[in-house]
UniProtKB/Swiss-Prot annotation:
It comes from the Eukaryota. Belongs to the LCL2 family. Probable component of the endoplasmic reticulum-associated degradation (ERAD) pathway. One of its GO terms (biological process) is ERAD pathway. Residues 1-19 form the signal peptide. InterPro entries: LCL2. The keyword Signal applies. The gene is LCL2. CDD domains: LCL2-like. Keywords: Signal. This is Long chronological lifespan protein 2. It comes from Komagataella phaffii (strain GS115 / ATCC 20864).
Length: 120
């Protein structure tokens, strides 16, 4: 009987610890998620745009202040390249090209230019 009581106490204590860790883990994550969601509200984006002191062109994705829209940087410069269209007025950011894999042509700025001209 004494062994049963000790085992019950140990199992009960383990359940309390597991319940505490479970609650702490998910409770903390939920609060973090709520903070993140609150910081990514459309009003925040709008306020950043409206409260900018940029006197030229404010890039919509990066909030960089540049002379003209084509001068905007890519939002992820470490993994994207900026390809300016032949009209020199517009651009697109694409994933940085990788080496030719299994004979598939590399998608780089030359590929974007061909697509712009309707050659693909």
């Amino acid at each position: 009987m004494r062994g049963f009581v000790v085992a019950t106490i140990i199992v009960g204590a383990a359940n309390c610890v597991m319940a505490f860790d479970f609650e702490q883990f998910f409770g903390g994550q939920n609060r973090q998620q709520q903070r993140t969601q609150q910081n990514n509200q459309p009003q925040d984006y709008e306020q950043q745009q409206l409260n900018s002191d940029c006197q030229k062109y404010l890039c919509p994705e990066t909030f960089a202040c540049v002379a003209k829209p084509v001068d905007c940087p890519c939002p992820f410069p470490q993994s994207q390249i900026k390809c300016v269209f032949p009209d020199k007025q517009n651009f697109v950011c694409i994933s940085s090209p990788v080496d030719n894999v299994n004979g598939v042509p590399v998608r780089d700025c030359k590929w974007v230019e061909k697509a712009w001209k309707g050659l693909l």
